[in-house]
Amino acid sequence: MSGTILENLSGRKLSILVASLLLCQVLCFLLGGLYAPLPAGHVTVLGSLCREDHGRQNDTGFLLYSRGAGACIPVTREEVEQDSTKMANELVHVFQMPLPRDLRDLDYSRWQQNLIGVLQVEFGYDSSSELREPPRELQLTIDMRLAYRNKGDPDNGWKLYAHGVEHRYLDCVTSHVGPTETLYSCDMIPLFELGALHHSFYLLNLRFPLDTPSQMNLQFGHMHDLTLTAIHQNGGFTQIWLLLKTMLFPFVVGIMIWFWRRVHLLQRSPALLEYMLIYLGAALTFLNLPLEYLSLVYEMPYMLLLSDIRQGIFYAMLLTFWLVFAGEHMLIQDAPNKSTIRSRYWKHLSAVVVGCISLFVFDICERGVQLRNPFYSIWTTPLGAKVAMTFIVLAGVSAAIYFLFLCYMIWKVFRNIGDKRTSLPSMSQARRLHYEGLIYRFKFLMLATLVCAALTVAGFVMGQMAEGQWDWNDNVAIQPTSAFLTGVYGMWNIYIFALLILYAPSHKQWPTMHHSDETTQSNENIVASAASEEIEFNHLPSDSNPSEISSLTSFTRKVAFD
């Protein structure tokens, strides 16, 4: 067997390759750090109060807006306080997005991809009321109507996007105690999530119906300020992200074709590690495919779910590959048969499969339902919030356990390699130099794998926490920087690109020599290599199994000769 390119590539060429890949890695970090804005931005909108006619309350096509021709006449807080019924069942809280700036109307761009809304509620009781601390988990019923219009539409050309009557549960604390009323401020609650930001303007109407027979919203005194936080992906970050995907996609496809072609030129079936590399490259190619360009033309509310599925497939394949990659370099073959996933790694991978399926089910339960009802959220009920939080915590703990187990496997690889180095002094000088060079290369590659795994786990945990921070606590501020995101994404591509090159079969043909001539020829190679500026780690003739991908994995079966 000719071995892999990692074994046969000269020191100078390998150094040039590694330096080039490290330079690309630095450029990926700089691309996000210098040119991309923060991944997400948000705007805070204070609700406007409008009063509607009783006859239009059940008309879902009737929408009130606060800016433009035909806007509603705003109701002041003083007018509400002076009304004997506090305008019950007549008030509509209006939120029009985005807000104008410098007397100029702004609009959303399709580059911003998605929109998430969370609401902070403030309500009050008369100070004469005996209630001083509201009970926890107050159930609030909200009639929500979300509408949109585009550039060129008239000011009153709002079209209904979604309508629903939803329940939210509030945890509140006392914020102000006055002579006439006591105010309570509540934690943020998830309101809606749009997987596609296809239209220019959005309008949200909120009603809080009161009904005595069904005890609907009677535990609240009267609503005060409502604050909507609208979170969107920054368009500048999306452009940098798609630029990175567009540049990386053809390189990965090209190197996969090159790798698989070299494998099929061999007179053997592909090894397990070669299959795993091509599967990993396919998962990365699916992730790199810049499908987001389609959302600039078509409305694709399922893009968030599709992105989660693509990233989940890549994570599953990457985690699987690392376990197999470390296992194949253990240098311990329990059986002479060819390694398969089912025979050697099913115990290791069962946890990965269960974890990925659990996260997929969790994602489908939320974002799958949101395709039909953007107001749905698993965080809206106390039980759902606990289940969601449990999933996130378990995902983080599982990621940490996986990383520790991978560290243990790589440590075993290092220990096994160290144990086998004790046989090097009994070998000929040529073979000893050959294997010492291979050992250094494989150790460096294993350390690079460990760094890649650590950054991947850190990025996964930060992503889960950043996604849920608006749902569990408004005081948490976790947002991965653009440099970190583009750097980690580039690292995945560079790492897999390097593996496909280094583990491709080498087609160098070395002349066959008799055993009696090998020592003389090896010594001549050593002298020539020492005098050369470029040292070649030549593959020495051996009786290695042709099904093995690397000569290092057959190290234990090599017989030293002089």
Swiss-Prot record:
It is a multi-pass membrane protein. Residues 35-239, 292-311, 366-390, 463-482 are lumenal. It comes from the Eukaryota. Residues 1-13, 261-270, 333-344, 412-441, 504-562 are cytoplasmic. The keyword Cytoplasm does not apply. InterPro entries: WLS-like_TM, WLS_GOLD, Wntless. It is found in: Presynaptic cell membrane; Postsynaptic cell membrane; Cell membrane; Endoplasmic reticulum membrane. One of its GO terms (biological process) is positive regulation of Wnt signaling pathway. Pfam families: WLS-like_TM, WLS_GOLD. The chain crosses the membrane at residues 14-34, 240-260, 271-291, 312-332, 345-365, 391-411, 442-462, 483-503. GO terms for cellular component: cell projection; endoplasmic reticulum membrane; endosome membrane; Golgi membrane; neuromuscular junction; plasma membrane; postsynaptic membrane; presynaptic membrane. GO terms for molecular function: Wnt-protein binding. Glycans are attached at N58. Keywords: Cell membrane, Cell projection, Developmental protein, Endoplasmic reticulum, Endosome, Glycoprotein, Golgi apparatus, Membrane, Postsynaptic cell membrane, Segmentation polarity protein, Synapse, Transmembrane, Transmembrane helix, Wnt signaling pathway. PANTHER family: INTEGRAL MEMBRANE PROTEIN GPR177, PROTEIN WNTLESS HOMOLOG. Interacts with wg; in the Golgi. Interacts with Vps35, a component of the retromer complex; wls stability is regulated by Vps35. Belongs to the wntless family. A segment polarity gene required for wingless (wg)-dependent patterning processes, acting in both wg-sending cells and wg-target cells. In non-neuronal cells wls directs wg secretion. The wls traffic loop encompasses the Golgi, the cell surface, an endocytic compartment and a retrograde route leading back to the Golgi, and involves clathrin-mediated endocytosis and the retromer complex (a conserved protein complex consisting of Vps35 and Vps26). In neuronal cells (the larval motorneuron NMJ), the wg signal moves across the synapse via the release of wls-containing exosome-like vesicles. This is Protein wntless. It comes from Drosophila yakuba (Fruit fly).
